[in-house]
Amino acid sequence: MLTLRRFLATLGPGTVWLTLFLVLPLLIVFVYSLLTRTDVGQVGLPFTLENWQRVFGYDALFEEFVPDNLQVLWRSVWVAGLATGLCVLLGYPLAFYIAAQSERRRRLLLLLLIIPFWTNFLIRIYAWIIILRPFGLFPSTLAVLLGMTYAYLPFFVLPVYASVEKVDWRLVEAAEDLGATPARAFWAAVVPQTLPGLVAGVILTFVPALGTFVVSDILGGAKTALVGNLVQNQFGQSGDWAYGSALSFLLLAVVLIGLWLYARAAGQRGLEDLA
């Protein structure tokens, strides 16, 4: 009885919250993906797997596979991965640079990093159209990649910076005393200490980049369709909520598989940080 009371007092509120606002909505979306479209924005019986067949490219009318959705999904993973890679290349050294500054300058740099969040996201993305316009016909995919990197770079830098602040630099001195080069000492003594922030930063960057549709709509000019655009169109213009729900679950599955693979690649420590 005492154990039950402790559970209700500690994990109980969190469990109820996750059940009501995470598990239950996901179950509703999954049920929608199995229903039949009856009208614009309406679904009903009977249950069917047609929506899932369409997700994986099977055209029931012509009884053939048209892998358009899978191509869009692959493009989305590719662009999100590139944006995440750019955030790593730019954000990792930036986090070290900020941490190496004086207290006053460090606060200023962090403020400058956070200031964009004070402006509406749409306004910031539209501003990039004005910035890129003088360069003429800017490739749509490159513009989308640039917009994603700009939008999600702070999400990568902040958790990495939090890890860099806790780095024990005495381990670097010990590695150099044992004959390691500066690069080897950094890789062996510093990178493992920043791995928690690196894992968190990659996740916070890749997941929203994979599902975004605003950046590709505005900067891509509807020429670079990503999976987020497909989902948004089903719940908006097309009004096919059943098919949109199936696409949403496909996107969720890809994200979960990607996180699992990244955790495995990062090793046991990365898995613990992810949990």
Show which residues each predicted segment covers:
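C-terminal transmembrane helix and the adjacent membrane-cytosol boundary/short C-terminal tail
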Residues: 2, 9, 161-176, 188, ...
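Amphipathic cytosolic juxtamembrane alpha-helices at the membrane-cytosol interface
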Residues: 4-5, 78, 104-107, 141-143, ...
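Interhelical loop and adjacent transmembrane-helix boundary motif
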Residues: 4-6, 38, 51-61, 217-264
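Transmembrane alpha-helices
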Residues: 12-24, 115, 150-152, 156-169, ...
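N-terminal signal-anchor/first transmembrane alpha helix
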Residues: 1-29, 107
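Short membrane-interfacial helix/loop motifs at transmembrane-helix boundaries
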Residues: 25-65, 131, 217, 221-222, ...
